Amino acid sequence: MMYLGGKATVAKPIARFFAAQTTRSYWEPFVGAASVIAEMPPSWIRYGSDLEQSMIILLQAVQTGWKPPLVTERMRCQLREKNDPLDPCTAVAKFGCSFRGCAWGGYTYKSAKQNFALTARNTLIKLAPKIRDVIFKFSDYLTAGISADLIYCDPPYKDTYSVGCKSDFNHAQFWEWASKQESLIAVTERSAPAGWVKVWYKVKNQGFKNRDGTYLVERLWLREDQLPRWNRDLKTSVRCWNLNPLLVDRIRKKRAMVENRIGALP
């Protein structure tokens, strides 16, 4: 379903890269709508935590077989008034039926191309078998107390629209924490401090820009001191992300068109 800052469009290539590592336990401290963790090998021990309690409650309900209803505008108003994070319907209405997946944004039921309420419901039903064994926890990344071989962080992006209760997110504190982790760690963000290496980027086709007028670009960062620990046979997959060769030329042409329009991307 729609979730501001979600990784649904890039979840499979990101998960494919992580799954090629020799680790067997995985943690997402900002699991969000669980797009990436759902694509990770089910044989791995997978942990997903988040400070957005309503999403954790929703994911826990979905993994046990709960099927969300179609949220009407009237139902959404009632859910918003109650705003009960322990009701799994709350997150469906709060994000899945909101404009662009923003927390309690304008109600979005359907357009000429898509029924958003139905899409949210169907997406969650399809998600259920993929997250059945995931251990979800409502917690801040600092206090989660979870240990894993590989950590993937998708924190709220700096200087972009906030998600849920994360508008006061301390970015400096996060990077300090990430730089001290002994586990392999990867981060998606617009930029990173010294000591981090960008290994991939993609211009997101979202139909709107960041607050500063720039296009949103997804970037994956790895710690420079940890590079030797990543699978060194994956240089090609890091560069072109294991894409079907037939798609590479199309992507290169699209990327060239974007760069000609907005300037060379970093």
Map each language-model feature to its residues.
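Long, positively charged, glycine-interspersed low-complexity recognition regions
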Residues: 165-266
